[in-house]
């Protein structure tokens, strides 16, 4: 039987990676129905990172903006996820523990299902407290392995990190290849190794297209057992952004995976509203 691979539209990161501002809340709520109509996304990245800061620059209330933006996806049965910086929350400097605990409760109340937590240093001590905070708030805790290429960052290095995060109770693992420099075969070995540690752990692959590895990497991680792939959409895909959903869908379908079909009329609606 074909193995299913699901797609997540990294809407927030598409804009950030293109150097563009996130749309206003009225624009977000206008494009949401067309994204849903495309029929191919199991998840959408709706907030986190620098999203709320941009809302503030627009003079918008981030709390209201995120609630209105996530609402139609929930009604359609699509999960929403956000990015957070572990010890730093949404900032670039440490945040007190009591603030971080409240932060996840607020995000859940706003309508965010999954929190993707990362530490640029790959220090699990910075990530593990967030697992408990997310669970206390009723959120799914997805913890990241930040991918780079060096003599130190071996397959064993990443598997040891994944094992510690899984033992600490994380629900999912994200292979966060944010520079797009992970080598395809290497990443396939990492994913396969994680599935050996815990067969039913959900793995989501996030990558950027710049260096040119990521289409091959997507194929390799899916062959190794990856469950979700982050994708972008033209005109904000490729380059410093992410692989386009059309290309990823075609490649995986040709490779024998079960992937969702794309409503191309809706795709063009989304493009015209981005």
Tell where the protein language model's regions lie, with residue ranges:
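Catalytic cores and adjacent flexible loops of soluble metabolic enzymes
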Residues: 1-116, 120-274
């Amino acid at each position: 039987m074909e193995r299913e691979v699901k797609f997540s539209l990294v809407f927030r990161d598409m804009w950030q990676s293109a150097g563009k501002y996130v749309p206003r809340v009225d624009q977000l709520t206008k494009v949401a129905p067309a994204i849903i109509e495309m029929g191919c996304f199991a998840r959408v990245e709706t907030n986190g990172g620098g999203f709320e800061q941009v809302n503030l620059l627009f003079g918008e209330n981030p709390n209201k903006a995120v609630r209105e933006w996530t609402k139609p996806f929930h009604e359609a049965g699509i999960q929403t996820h956000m990015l957070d910086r572990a010890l730093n929350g949404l900032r670039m400097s440490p945040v007190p523990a009591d603030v971080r605990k409240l932060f996840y409760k607020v995000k859940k109340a706003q309508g965010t299902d999954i929190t993707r937590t990362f530490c640029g240093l790959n220090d699990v001590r910075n990530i593990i407290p967030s697992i408990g905070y997310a669970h206390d708030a009723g959120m799914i805790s997805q913890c990241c392995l930040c991918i780079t290429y060096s003599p130190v960052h071996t397959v064993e290095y990443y598997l040891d990190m994944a094992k510690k995060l899984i033992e600490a109770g994380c629900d999912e693992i994200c292979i966060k290849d944010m520079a797009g420099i992970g080598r395809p075969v290497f990443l396939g070995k990492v994913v396969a190794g994680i599935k050996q540690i815990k067969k039913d752990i959900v793995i989501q692959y996030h990558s950027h297209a710049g260096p040119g590895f990521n289409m091959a990497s997507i194929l390799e991680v899916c062959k190794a057992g990856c469950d979700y792939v982050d994708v972008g959409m033209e005109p904000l895909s490729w380059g410093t952004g992410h692989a386009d959903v059309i290309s990823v869908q075609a490649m995986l379908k040709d490779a024998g995976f079960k992937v969702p079909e794309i409503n191309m009329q809706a795709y063009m609606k989304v493009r015209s509203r981005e």
